[in-house]
């Protein structure tokens, strides 16, 4: 039974780390990007998620991100988020490394979250170092008087605090994630297609350092051939079931 084996590996491990992708938030109603119903099948990322797109039409890009923010603000963390937060509280999980920008891990109670692709709730100035993080529960960052919004420090445009196609990942987040990958005994890989690098390299780094890899995904991924344990379920139901198995072992 993959669930039983996964639970045993987690309980026996000294250091467990998780890598999450869009599938972890899918059961919260957040659309994924890839797959047959993915956002990139409906929208062209070159028109919405690149520095060139923002330079060409910042209002259009902001309208897209405000639409996504409103979708996320309506969502609630699902068991894929809440179980991970519980595991961290109980000393069973070192950190969450996420490709997601929705902040649902933090809303569920996770404390150590490494955001590889930024945070959709953050506004950043294109010119100076000004940035702010909006609180959706207080209605912040859901609409602006003008698009693009302007920096209160220098007056230049603000942009969403996410990593766009063609941009490097934040170096501090990537270094922390790589260090966690090298030091963990078990890496749970939840809801990621394994197609976006360098995030997709992290499980391979962990494996090369002796870690057990556990994949939770309803579909086969580019990383599946490297996995030691595979749970072919959606993230929310799989994490609920995994937690039940873990509790039996504690």
UniProtKB/Swiss-Prot annotation:
EC number(s) stated in the UniProt entry for this protein: 2.3.1.286
Transmembrane helix found in the keyword field: no
Class of the enzyme per the UniProt entry, highest EC level: transferase
Reactions catalysed, as given in the entry: N(6)-acetyl-L-lysyl-[protein] + NAD(+) + H2O = 2''-O-acetyl-ADP-D-ribose + nicotinamide + L-lysyl-[protein]; N(6)-succinyl-L-lysyl-[protein] + NAD(+) + H2O = 2''-O-succinyl-ADP-D-ribose + nicotinamide + L-lysyl-[protein]
Binding residues annotated for Zn(2+), in chain numbering: 125, 128, 151, 154
Cofactor annotation comment: Binds 1 zinc ion per subunit.
SUPFAM superfamilies, alphabetized: DHS-like NAD/FAD-binding domain
Entry's Gene Ontology molecular function annotations: histone deacetylase activity, NAD-dependent; NAD+ binding; protein-malonyllysine demalonylase activity; protein-succinyllysine desuccinylase activity; zinc ion binding
Pfam families, sorted: SIR2
Active site: 117
GO cellular component terms listed in the entry, alphabetical order: cytoplasm
Location within or outside the cell: Cytoplasm
Binding site for NAD(+): 21-40, 99-102, 191-193, 217-219, 235
Co-factor(s): Zn(2+)
Domain Deacetylase sirtuin-type: 1-250
Sequence positions that bind substrate: 65, 68
Main localization of the protein described in the UniProt heading: cytoplasm
InterPro entries (UniProt xref): DHS-like_NAD/FAD-binding_dom, NAD-dep_sirtuin_deacylases, Sirtuin, Sirtuin_cat_small_dom_sf, Sirtuin_class_III, Ssirtuin_cat_dom
Record's comment describing the protein's domains: 2 residues (Tyr-65 and Arg-68) present in a large hydrophobic pocket are probably involved in substrate specificity. They are important for desuccinylation activity, but dispensable for deacetylation activity.
Family from the record: Belongs to the sirtuin family. Class III subfamily.
Known role: NAD-dependent lysine deacetylase and desuccinylase that specifically removes acetyl and succinyl groups on target proteins. Modulates the activities of several proteins which are inactive in their acylated form. Deacetylates the N-terminal lysine residue of Alba, the major archaeal chromatin protein and that, in turn, increases Alba's DNA binding affinity, thereby repressing transcription.
UniProt xrefs under NCBIfam families: PRK00481.1-3, prot_deacyl_CobB
Protein name: NAD-dependent protein deacylase
Gene name as annotated: cobB
């Amino acid at each position: 039974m993959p669930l039983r084996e996964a639970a045993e590996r987690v309980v026996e491990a000294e250091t467990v780390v998780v890598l999450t992708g869009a599938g972890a938030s899918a059961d919260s109603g957040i659309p994924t990007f890839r797959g047959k119903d993915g956002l990139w099948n409906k929208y062209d990322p070159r028109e919405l998620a690149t520095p060139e797109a923002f330079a060409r039409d910042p209002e259009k890009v902001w309208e897209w991100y405000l639409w996504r923010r409103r979708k996320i603000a309506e969502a609630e963390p699902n068991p894929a988020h809440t179980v991970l937060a519980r595991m961290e509280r109980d000393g069973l999980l070192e950190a969450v490394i996420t490709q997601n920008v929705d902040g649902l891990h933090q809303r569920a109670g996770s404390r150590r979250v490494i955001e590889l692709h930024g945070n959709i709730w953050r506004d950043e100035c294109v010119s100076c170092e000004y940035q702010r993080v909006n609180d959706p529960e207080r209605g912040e960052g859901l609409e602006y008087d003008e698009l693009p919004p302007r920096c209160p420090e220098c007056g230049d445009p603000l942009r969403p605090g996410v990593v766009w196609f063609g941009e490097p990942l934040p170096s501090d987040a990537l270094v922390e994630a790589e260090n966690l990958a090298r030091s963990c005994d078990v890496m749970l890989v939840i809801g990621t297609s394994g197609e976006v690098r360098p995030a997709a390299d992290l499980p391979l780094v962990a494996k090369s350092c002796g870690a057990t890899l556990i994949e939770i995904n309803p579909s086969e991924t580019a990383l599946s051939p490297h996995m030691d344990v595979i749970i072919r379920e959606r993230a929310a139901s799989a994490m609920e079931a995994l937690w039940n198995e873990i509790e039996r072992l504690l």
